């Protein structure tokens, strides 16, 4: 049975999440509330919410966990040319936290293969907007000719970034935002981006799965670090074009 959490009930251990033999592997708990304080506590424990309209708030901690190590980010030859163009042409901009709510709404409206509707409900937007106002959630946005054409958002505590969703209204626009995020996190020695669940797209960019135990142990250490700044200059992306992945960083987490 999945426990029901009252307003003052703590999360159970992530080891109590449902296993692969269940119909919902990784499901840990359910609740009626999505208070910012509950959300913050969840992320610091390696837990995230994922549910649809009409459902209670469902809390997850899957095993294995999909991550992206910034040092392992893969850039194809074609995308390398795209990034060079973004750096060269002033009509391309990468902005941070310029339109957080707009990015969330665009992610909610983006069509997803095999998915009807969206899990980014009005309640989710309100909760993450509260985290954004507190400085704990951020958007990375791709702008072209003064128009926002792609982006992503996520949660950041200490030296840990938890990715949530992305969208694109122009070719490679979400990937450009991800590259900018990776460059920013590498510059500030962030070793891991939480990607939650495995997708072929994330795997093609260097994402991989690690054991939940390894993930949670890293989160515990990383969120205790001082927060990183969120001021951004797109020239930091140039570092991705001339630096090979660090073997030390790449080997830091068990496969």
Curated annotation (Swiss-Prot):
Subcellular location: Cytoplasm
Keyword Acyltransferase included in the entry's annotation: yes
EC category: transferase
GO molecular function per UniProt: leucyl-tRNA--protein transferase activity
Role according to the record: Functions in the N-end rule pathway of protein degradation where it conjugates Leu, Phe and, less efficiently, Met from aminoacyl-tRNAs to the N-termini of proteins containing an N-terminal arginine or lysine.
Superkingdom field: Bacteria
Organism (species): Burkholderia pseudomallei (strain 668)
Family (UniProt): Belongs to the L/F-transferase family.
UniProt keyword terms in alphabetical order: Acyltransferase, Cytoplasm, Transferase
Gene3D superfamilies documented for this protein: Leucyl/phenylalanyl-tRNA-protein transferase, C-terminal domain, Leucyl/phenylalanyl-tRNA-protein transferase, N-terminal domain
UniProt-listed InterPro entries: Acyl_CoA_acyltransferase, Leu/Phe-tRNA_Trfase, Leu/Phe-tRNA_Trfase_C, Leu/Phe-tRNA_Trfase_N
Protein's name according to its UniProt entry: Leucyl/phenylalanyl-tRNA--protein transferase
The UniProt record lists the keyword Hydrolase: no
Reaction equation(s) it catalyzes: N-terminal L-lysyl-[protein] + L-leucyl-tRNA(Leu) = N-terminal L-leucyl-L-lysyl-[protein] + tRNA(Leu) + H(+); N-terminal L-arginyl-[protein] + L-leucyl-tRNA(Leu) = N-terminal L-leucyl-L-arginyl-[protein] + tRNA(Leu) + H(+); L-phenylalanyl-tRNA(Phe) + an N-terminal L-alpha-aminoacyl-[protein] = an N-terminal L-phenylalanyl-L-alpha-aminoacyl-[protein] + tRNA(Phe)
GO cellular component, one term: cytoplasm
EC number(s) stated in the UniProt entry for this protein: 2.3.2.6
């Amino acid at each position: 049975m999945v426990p029901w959490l009252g307003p003052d009930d703590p999360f159970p251990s992530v080891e109590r999440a449902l296993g692969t033999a269940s119909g919902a592997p990784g499901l840990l708990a359910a609740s009626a509330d999505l208070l910012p304080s509950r959300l913050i506590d969840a992320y610091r424990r390696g837990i995230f919410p994922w549910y649809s309209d009409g459902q209670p708030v469902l809390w997850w901690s899957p095993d294995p966990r999909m991550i992206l190590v910034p040092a392992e980010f893969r850039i194809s030859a074609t995308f390398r040319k795209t990034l060079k163009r973004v750096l060269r042409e002033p009509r391309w901009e990468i902005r941070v936290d310029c339109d957080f709510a707009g990015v969330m709404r665009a992610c909610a409206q983006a069509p997803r293969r095999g998915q009807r509707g969206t899990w980014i409900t009005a309640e989710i937007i309100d909760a993450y907007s509260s985290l954004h106002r507190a400085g704990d959630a951020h958007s990375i946005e791709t702008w072209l000719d003064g128009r926002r054409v792609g982006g992503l958002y996520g949660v950041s505590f200490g030296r840990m970034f938890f990715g949530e969703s992305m969208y694109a209204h122009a070719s490679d626009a979400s990937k450009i935002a991800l590259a900018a995020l990776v460059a920013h996190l590498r510059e500030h020695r962030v070793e891991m981006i939480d990607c939650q669940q495995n997708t072929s797209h994330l795997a093609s960019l260097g994402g991989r799965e690690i054991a939940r135990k390894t993930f949670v142990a890293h989160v515990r250490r990383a969120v205790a670090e001082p927060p990183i700044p969120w001021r951004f200059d797109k020239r930091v992306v140039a570092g991705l074009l001339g630096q090979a992945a660090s073997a030390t960083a790449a080997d830091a987490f068990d496969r």
